[in-house]
């Protein structure tokens, strides 16, 4: 009786530990392999124990079938999934779509019954062949006419995964990356319906602000700024998460995005605060080479000799040096974000992207690989 009771208690404890654990969903981008020198990142550089889920971005769709994108994707798939040899609890997913894929191609497939069916049927064998545990849908973004088709695609994909798992296989996971912008949420997603069929939802709570605004501003604020104009009251993490929950997304399926990159601007005057006029995006980073975007490891370089400020109400930092301004996340701000998602009882955090963090541990002076992602992991584990 005593032994049985203690065994039962142990089982309950294990279940509680399992089911109360937060997800840490981390994206890896295949094009990071092409960055020069120390910016080049391959899947074998990733920490197999850092994240609960790693999502490989992106797969393509050719002739209505899921397909590789890069010439060496199959090799990189193998590198990634080898990480599970020493951490069998790690889950890997393959993300299909992305910015370069475009919305129109997704729309054409999802709106045609035969094309949609062909695509859906092609997914499980592809994932099984290459060792993935699931699929992530990154349709950026469904148009107003696509809203129902996106719901149907998700519903039918999930049904196929359930059917495919019948012979005793472990069921494939299905997730989606969704915009955090109110206008896109309203036009693109039937949140309550798609939530029923997704294992988790990654809400992209970043890129709220960019050079198109004509002024400086943080791209991933936790809260609304004190001086935000009317439309800007929606452009923050707190509003996006709350709105998703009000629309019917279960907190237990919502994974909150935290960026390991910053958005930069070139200042147009001597003003350097939030809302200062700009002449355009910031100068490209040495490795990422994209105007207006800096990887966290490039930001660590930028911070040498820069002036750092904190936007207290939004709980995020920005830095200025000369005519350059960059809003980013640091270890302090990600801890605030993790505490927020815990208070909201969300499923966990999502990171875009591992290859934009200091993955070598050589840029940020901490002798620590993936310092931002590790800070998120530690905060998730803290009681």
From Swiss-Prot:
InterPro entries recorded: Chitinase_II/V-like_cat, Chitinase_insertion_sf, Glyco_hydro18_cat, Glycoside_hydrolase_SF, Glycosyl_Hydrlase_18
Glycosylation sites: 60
Binding annotation for chitin: 70-71, 97-100, 141, 204-207, 263, 352
Upregulation: Up-regulated in colon under several inflammatory conditions. Down-regulated by hyperoxia in bronchial epithelial cells.
Limits of the GH18 domain: 22-383
PROSITE patterns: GH18_2
PTM comment text: Glycosylated.
Family, per entry: Belongs to the glycosyl hydrolase 18 family.
Protein name per the record: Chitinase-3-like protein 1
Organism name: Homo sapiens (Human)
Taxonomic lineage from the root: Eukaryota, Metazoa, Chordata, Craniata, Vertebrata
Gene name linked to the record: CHI3L1
């Amino acid at each position: 009786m005593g032994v049985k009771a203690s065994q039962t208690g142990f089982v309950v404890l294990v279940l509680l530990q399992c089911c109360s654990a937060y997800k840490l969903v981390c994206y890896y981008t295949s094009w990071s392999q092409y960055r020069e020198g120390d910016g080049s990142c391959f899947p074998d550089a990733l920490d197999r124990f850092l994240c609960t889920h790693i999502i490989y971005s992106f797969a393509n769709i050719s002739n209505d079938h899921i397909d590789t994108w890069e010439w060496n994707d199959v090799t990189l798939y193998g590198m990634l999934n080898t990480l599970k040899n020493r951490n069998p609890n790690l889950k890997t997913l393959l993300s299909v779509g992305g910015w370069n894929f475009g919305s129109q191609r997704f729309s054409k497939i999802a709106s045609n019954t035969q094309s949609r069916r062909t695509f859906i049927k092609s997914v499980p064998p592809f994932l099984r062949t290459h060792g993935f545990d699931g699929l992530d849908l990154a349709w950026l973004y469904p148009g107003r006419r696509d809203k129902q088709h996106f719901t149907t695609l998700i519903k039918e994909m999930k049904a196929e995964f359930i059917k495919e798992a019948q012979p005793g296989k472990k069921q494939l996971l299905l997730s989606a990356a969704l915009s955090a912008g109110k206008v896109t949420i309203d036009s693109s997603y039937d949140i309550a319906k798609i939530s029923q069929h997704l294992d988790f939802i990654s809400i992209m709570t970043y890129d709220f602000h960019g050079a198109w605004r004509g002024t400086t501003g943080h791209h991933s604020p936790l809260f609304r700024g004190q001086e935000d104009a009317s439309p800007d009251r929606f452009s923050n993490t707190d509003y996006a998460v709350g709105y998703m929950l009000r629309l019917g997304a279960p907190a237990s399926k919502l994974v909150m995005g935290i960026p390991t990159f910053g958005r930069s601007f070139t200042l147009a005057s001597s003003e350097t605060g939030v809302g200062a006029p700009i002449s355009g995006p910031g100068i490209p980073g040495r490795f990422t080479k994209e105007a207006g975007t800096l990887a966290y490891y490039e930001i660590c370089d930028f911070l040498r000799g820069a002036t750092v400020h904190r936007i207290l109400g939004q709980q995020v930092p920005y830095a200025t040096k000369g005519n350059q301004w960059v809003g980013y996340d640091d270890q302090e701000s990600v801890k605030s974000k993790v505490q927020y998602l815990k208070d909201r009882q969300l499923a966990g955090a999502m990171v875009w992207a591992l290859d934009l963090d200091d993955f070598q541990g050589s840029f940020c002076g901490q002798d620590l690989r993936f310092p931002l992602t590790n800070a998120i992991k530690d905060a998730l584990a803290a009681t």
